[in-house]
Amino acid sequence: MGQKVNPVGFRLGVNRGWDSVWYAKKKDFGNYLIEDFKIRAYIKKNVVNSGVSKVMIERTSNKCFVTIYTSRPGFVIGKKGSDIDKIKNNLSKFTNNEVTLNIKEVKKPETNAYLVAENIAQQLVKRISYRRAMKRAMQSCLRLGAKGIKVSISGRLGGNEIARTEWLREGSIPSHTLRADIDYAEAEALTTFGIIGIKIWIYKGEVFAKEFSQETNKIVPKEVKE
């Protein structure tokens, strides 16, 4: 069953954290959940071509902290911070709490599963060969230190009448090992032949001991076995 379970959800609380961190009373839970959905939908729609990999949302009683992880922070911030002020003002419309917006850079976008999936999707839209896109992404990922990568593409590949699934794997992808740091993401490419689905698994090593971080107030991996 290891191959059928979402690797991120499978490891939540073990070596992965939640993208939304807050506590709410029963009457407020639904409202906060909808607010999170609207915030992420706005960022995905309006912050385009900026390499946004994920959006972290943390809440206190009267504040909402939104952290955007991106490989191109300059595109998100804009000239003299003009774009980030616009994003902050628009996000304030989705919640009654004060919004604090932070931008964090993704150092190695080639080893980030979501950014790799989006990159392949963009190449497929431009009619680049799916095999070339897959192999190029895998080579870049392994060259920058990943221990293994698996790429799966489904749909009318090459414009064929019958949809099929093709996948490639290099290195190790230990699906059942909970201490394995596996990044997983999905993306869709809207082509003239229909939607093509892309799934990415990236294995970065094994996480062993953990320690408490005073800075982030979270339990973080202490050592990753290379």
UniProtKB/Swiss-Prot annotation:
Pfam families for the chain: KH_2, Ribosomal_S3_C
Under the heading HAMAP family, the entry gives: Ribosomal_uS3_B (MF_01309_B)
Quote the Gene3D superfamilies the UniProt record gives.
3.30.300.20, Ribosomal protein S3, C-terminal domain
Per its record, what are the GO molecular function terms?
mRNA binding; rRNA binding; structural constituent of ribosome
**Any one annotated GO CC term:** cytosolic small ribosomal subunit
Under InterPro entries, the record lists: KH_dom (IPR004087), KH_dom-like_a/b (IPR015946), KH_dom_type_2 (IPR004044), KH_sf_prok-type (IPR009019), Ribosomal_S3_C_sf (IPR036419), Ribosomal_uS3_bac-typ (IPR005704), Ribosomal_uS3_C (IPR001351), Ribosomal_uS3_CS (IPR018280)
Residues annotated as domain KH type-2: 39-107
**Highest taxon of the lineage:** Bacteria
Please cite one Gene Ontology biological process associated with this protein. Answer: translation
Q: Quaternary form?
A: Part of the 30S ribosomal subunit. Forms a tight complex with proteins S10 and S14.
Which PANTHER family does the record match to this protein?
30S/40S RIBOSOMAL PROTEIN S3, SMALL RIBOSOMAL SUBUNIT PROTEIN US3C
Tell me which family the UniProt entry assigns to this protein.
Answer: Belongs to the universal ribosomal protein uS3 family.
Q: What is this protein called?
A: Small ribosomal subunit protein uS3
Could you tell me what this protein does? Binds the lower part of the 30S subunit head. Binds mRNA in the 70S ribosome, positioning it for translation.
Please provide the record's keywords in A-Z order. Answer: Ribonucleoprotein, Ribosomal protein, RNA-binding, rRNA-binding
